[in-house]
């Protein structure tokens, strides 16, 4: 009788544990879904200010990237498009949505290197922005992914980012407090 009672309690405890783990899984999933919905909404808002081919890019990379990665790519591409509008004479009268793939295809590795130099210090909407080696590397990685997608899917016929070296990340010095 005692043995049967212990087995019964063990089964009840096991069911309680399963119910608790199911509850936590559902709770975590609900949080994850909320964050994902919020991120997708933000991404759609960012895409509204981009050329139409960017939407295809974000749809294409969706299965292999997280929503936060796609948002970071959107910010980085937005910065690149702003740079083109500001510095490229053929883009002076255009908006971001008007940028054509032909323009992206005409860019050279030197143009990409000039963009990286621009990123080290620029002013946007009256606010000064700087990027260290890590920021430059991330923005170039975003741009490379974008160009690679366009090249792989035959939107463009050359990828100038392929010939640009990634910025070297130097080790941070260890500062000791005395």
Residue ranges and their predicted role:
Residues 178:
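Short, conserved phosphate/pyrophosphate- and ester-handling motifs at nucleotide-, phospho-/glycolipid
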Residues 53-68, 78-173:
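N-terminal core-binding DNA-recognition domain of tyrosine recombinases/integrases
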Residues 1-102:
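Basic/aromatic DNA-contact patch characteristic of tyrosine site-specific recombinases
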């Amino acid at each position: 009788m005692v043995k049967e009672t212990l087995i019964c309690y063990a089964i009840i405890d096991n069911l309680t544990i399963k119910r608790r783990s199911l509850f936590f899984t559902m709770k975590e999933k609900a949080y994850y879904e909320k964050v994902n919905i919020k991120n997708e909404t933000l991404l759609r808002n960012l895409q509204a200010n981009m050329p139409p081919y960017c939407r295809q890019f974000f749809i294409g990379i969706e299965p292999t990237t997280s929503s936060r990665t796609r948002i970071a790519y959107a910010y980085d591409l937005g910065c690149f498009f702003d740079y083109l509008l500001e510095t490229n004479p053929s883009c002076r009268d255009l908006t971001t949505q008007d940028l054509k793939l032909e323009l992206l295809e005409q860019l050279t590795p030197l143009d990409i290197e000039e963009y990286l130099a621009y990123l080290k210090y620029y002013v946007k909407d009256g606010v000064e922005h700087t990027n260290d080696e890590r920021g430059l590397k991330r923005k170039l990685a975003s741009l490379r992914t974008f160009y690679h997608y366009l090249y792989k899917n035959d939107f463009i016929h050359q990828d100038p980012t392929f010939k640009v070296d990634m910025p070297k990340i130097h080790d941070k010095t260890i500062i000791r407090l005395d």
